[in-house]
């Protein structure tokens, strides 16, 4: 699925140099000439989330973020400007980039039984005490449906 919030990523097999057997894979997350990102990243980081745990929800007032689950499986929950929720599953085995524009609140839940790792590319580097991120709540959202996945 590719749309304004999701871009499917290219995953290529890698081969052993001696006999050409498949020895892994390479996932292309960002190339300058792909034009996936409107602004080049100013900050890149990896964060982990424990099994069954929720990160967020929060809102970035100045920054657009792009997320890729590089280990495990998570669901991103975005609250669009019309108040409707969008749920996007991101899995390291089927990589996709989730785009969260500034002022769109989001959270993510680890759906795997192990720690999941999310790589973030942001168009604005965070600075301590810049008050750019606001914690909020999704009071009308049913978080319990994701607890069954674990």
Protein language model features and the residues they cover:
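Non-catalytic, conserved peripheral segments adjacent to functional cores
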Residues: 1-97, 113-150
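Asparagine-centered strand-capping/turn motif at beta-strand->loop junctions
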Residues: 109-111
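Conserved SET/PR-domain catalytic core that frames the SAM/AdoMet-binding pocket
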Residues: 94-107
């Amino acid at each position: 699925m590719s749309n304004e919030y999701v871009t499917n990523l290219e995953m290529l097999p890698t081969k052993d140099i001696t006999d050409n057997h498949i020895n892994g894979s390479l996932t292309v997350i960002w190339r300058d000439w792909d034009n996936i990102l409107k602004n080049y990243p100013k900050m890149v980081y990896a964060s982990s989330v424990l099994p069954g745990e929720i990160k967020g929800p929060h809102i970035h007032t100045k920054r657009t973020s792009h997320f890729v689950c590089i280990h495990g499986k998570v669901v991103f929950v975005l609250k669009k400007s019309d108040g409707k929720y969008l749920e996007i599953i991101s899995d390291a085995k089927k990589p996709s980039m989730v785009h969260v524009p500034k002022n769109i609140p989001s959270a993510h839940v680890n759906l795997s039984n192990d720690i999941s790792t999310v790589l973030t590319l942001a168009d604005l580097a965070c600075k301590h005490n810049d008050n750019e991120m606001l914690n909020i709540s999704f009071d009308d959202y049913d978080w319990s449906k994701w607890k069954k996945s674990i």
